[in-house]
A protein has these predicted regions:
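Intrinsically disordered, low-complexity, charge-rich terminal extensions
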Residues: 1-190
Length: 190
């Protein structure tokens, strides 16, 4: 008998928005995201893609939002953030389940800390944590988004999956377009 390696299968969902020129990969692992992009390139033959890049430092925008600068229409602050001292090896403050517009947070900002992760909510439909690396974490569709599914046709599991995907992709598209404008994301040269 020859030894056999165990095959581990996995599934990673992704959404291509060719109209707006981005790919959203549902993975917490950068390596998994790169594997998905490799598979897309293999299937299509060529697929030029670059990671997101902002013209303005995301830390300064996130810090401004938590300091009281106006958020883009539709966005509101969540109850979670991470702030870091900009010096190497500086202090890190993590807040969860906390009002972010308060004296305690203001004191950290006055001490020079910058926001590196910030929980945000889009129109009571989607909550997420945006990092200064432009990675969206903890993406969650809220009741406001899922209420729209109650009116969907109940023609079976396939129809429900199609409706869920359509709803989720529309919300992700709205989120991306809002963040693209707010963070001044640069487009790849074509």
């Amino acid at each position: 008998l020859l030894p056999r390696a165990f095959v581990k299968s996995s599934r990673t969902d992704a959404m291509l928005d060719l109209q707006h020129g981005y790919v959203a990969v549902d993975s917490s692992s950068r390596k998994s995201g790169e594997n998905v992009m490799s598979e897309i390139r293999g299937a299509l033959g060529s697929f030029p893609a670059l990671p997101l890049n902002a013209e303005v430092a995301p830390r300064s925008i996130l810090t401004g939002w938590i300091a009281g600068e106006p958020l883009p229409d539709g966005l509101s602050l969540g109850e979670e953030c991470e702030m870091k001292d900009p010096i190497e090896g500086g202090a890190v403050v993590k807040c969860q389940h906390q009002e972010l517009r308060c004296d305690e947070i203001d004191k950290h900002l006055e001490a020079g800390k910058q926001v590196t992760k910030l929980a945000l909510i889009l129109d009571d439909h989607v909550s997420f944590v945006l990092g200064d690396d432009l990675v969206i974490r903890k993406l969650k569709f809220l009741d406001g988004a899922l209420d729209q599914l109650e009116n969907a046709d109940q023609d079976g599991v396939r129809a429900e999956l199609d409706a869920r995907f359509a709803l989720m992709s529309a919300e992700v598209r709205r989120l991306f377009l809002l963040l693209e404008a707010a963070l001044k994301l640069s487009k790849a040269e074509t």
